[in-house]
Amino acid sequence: MLKLFGWAMMTAVAVGGTLSLARAEAMNAAAPVCRAGGSPAILVEVIGVRSDAGTVRVQAYGGDPARYFDKGTYIERIEMPTAQAREICVPLPKPGTYAISVRHDANGNGKADMKDGGGMSGNPQFSVWDLIVKNKPDPKQVQVHVGQGVTPVRVVMNYVQGGSFRPVATR
């Protein structure tokens, strides 16, 4: 399996360095939903992950926008090794309006700490203060309208760097 994964990675780089849905399918059990294209889903492209260590968690939120990102209110959650998490298919129950959060647990300890990265659909800007007091973005900034099919969403990861929370160089 590792040889197959290595071969797939080398092929992706040789063909242009982009990740494809085929690679996402190999890493994400929900990817066939995105490949088929007939069911509501979000294909999350994770940009700017600082390292391949740890895990990446993608959560989808629906329903009341005031409850987006509240603990335990997600409707779908996918977690996978960071090295395999660049395109992640998130199946959804029906067309509608959703929000996405992505967390990079850089040290894989399962706890939020200053080494972790994060991002949301719409890529709202956050300050370190926002993180400390747990401010949430305006729902209109993060909403994704999903129809009967696959909706692509690009999420740029941010990390605490000095006194700010911002993207690192894109990988």
Task: Give the residues covered by each predicted segment.
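Bacterial N-terminal signal peptides
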Residues: 8-18
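Extracellular beta-sheet/turn segments enriched in Thr/Pro/Gly and aliphatic residues
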Residues: 25-33, 124-163
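A short, amphipathic beta-strand motif
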Residues: 42-48, 58
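Beta-strand signatures of extracellular beta-sandwich domains
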Residues: 57-61, 101
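Short proline/glycine- and polar residue-rich coil/turn motifs
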Residues: 78-84, 145-147
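Exposed aromatic-hydrophobic patches
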Residues: 86-92
